[in-house]
Amino acid sequence: MAKKSAIEKNNRRKALAARYAAKRAQLKAAAMDENLSLEERFKARLKLAELPRNSAPNRVRNRCEITGRPRAFYRKLKMSRIALREYGSRGQVPGLVKSSW
């Protein structure tokens, strides 16, 4: 089980990223727009840099929904390899069958 503080910090980052997503996208579009003057594009870049650091989506870490483990994460199932093995052996993951040959 991951530290509760690490899980909560990641949840705060998710919320912050969602809150600033529209503003960030708007500023990015303005900064990349070649029809705007160089000065306006530069101002958009500066405003983008002023946004909270934790509002960037790449600061959010994929974590297991069950244990909070940050590594060995399966995106499709939103769980770590350890939780997947545990739940799979109990037959709680639909479509997952133990392999034998």
Curated annotation (Swiss-Prot):
The terms describing its cellular component in GO are: cytoplasm; small ribosomal subunit
Q: Which domain of life is it from?
A: Bacteria
- Annotated signal sequence is none
Q: Name one GO molecular function term.
A: rRNA binding
Isomerase as a keyword of this entry, yes or no, is no
* Keyword entries, A-Z: Ribonucleoprotein, Ribosomal protein, RNA-binding, rRNA-binding
Its Gene Ontology biological processes? Answer: translation
Keyword Transmembrane helix among UniProt keywords: no
The UniProt entry, under Pfam families, shows: Ribosomal_S14
Q: Describe its function.
A: Binds 16S rRNA, required for the assembly of 30S particles and may also be responsible for determining the conformation of the 16S rRNA at the A site.
Q: Which NCBIfam families match?
A: PRK08881.1 (NF006477)
Subunit arrangement?
Part of the 30S ribosomal subunit. Contacts proteins S3 and S10.
Family named by the database record: Belongs to the universal ribosomal protein uS14 family.
Supply the name of the protein: Small ribosomal subunit protein uS14
Recorded source organism is: Hyphomonas neptunium (strain ATCC 15444)
